[in-house]
Amino acid sequence: MSDSPFEAPNRVDFHFDVICPWAYQTSLWMREVAERRGLEVDWRFFSLEEVNRVEGKKHPWEREWSYGWSMMRIGALLKRHDPALNDAWYLRSGTALHVEGRQPHRAEVARDLLSEMGLDPGLVDEALADPTTHDDVRADHERVISMGGWGVPTLVFPGADEDVSRKIFGPVLIHPPTGDAADRLWDLVVGW
C-alpha cells in the first residue's frame, strides 16, 4: 500500500458492459486493486447497446436475445444468488470474448462458459425467461445515465445518496498495471 494524502474509499461500484474490451482491461486492474487494498467492488451493468441505439430500433430489453444485454441478464441472475458469481461471470465471459476469441454473446457459448465455471448451463435460459433480469440491468444502466454517465468503465464512489456519490468515467486501460503501479493509479483516480 502506498502512502496517500487522502482517505481512499473502501467501496466502488464498477459499471461495465461485457462487450467493451477497455472495461474488461480496467476490470483486471480493479480486481488487482481490490485484492491489494481490501476494496469492495460491486460489479454493476451499463449497456453500450442502449446508449448507442439508433432511434426507431428496438431497445435491448425488447429483443429476445441481445448481444451484450443478454450476457448482463445472466450476470444479474447470478448476482441474486451471490454477487461474487456476477464478478466471476464477467471475468469468464470477458476473458472468453477478449482473450480467447470465443463468442459468449451466443447462448450455446454462454452455456459452455457456465459449465466451465461449475454452474448449471440452464441458468442462461432461466435468466432469459425471467423478465426481472431486464429490470436489474436497466436500473444499473439508468443510474449511470442519471449521473451524467455515457460509457464504460464507469466507477461510482457511493455517498450517502446518489446526490453525493462521485462518478468517474475510466480509467480506460489497455495494459492494466499490477502491484505498486496498480496502487499508484488507484491513488490518482480516487484523488481526482
Please report, for each region that a protein language model flagged, where it lies by residue.
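A short beta-strand-turn-helix
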Residues: 1-10
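C-terminal cap of thioredoxin/glutaredoxin-like
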Residues: 28-34, 107-192
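Residue-level signal for beta-strand positions within conserved beta-sheet cores that form or flank
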Residues: 8, 37-39, 164
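A short linear-motif detector with a strong N-terminal bias
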Residues: 20-23, 133-135
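Structural alpha/beta surface segment adjacent to cysteine/selenocysteine redox centers
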Residues: 13, 18, 24-110, 188, ...
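Short, flexible segments with low predicted structural confidence
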Residues: 5, 85, 115-116
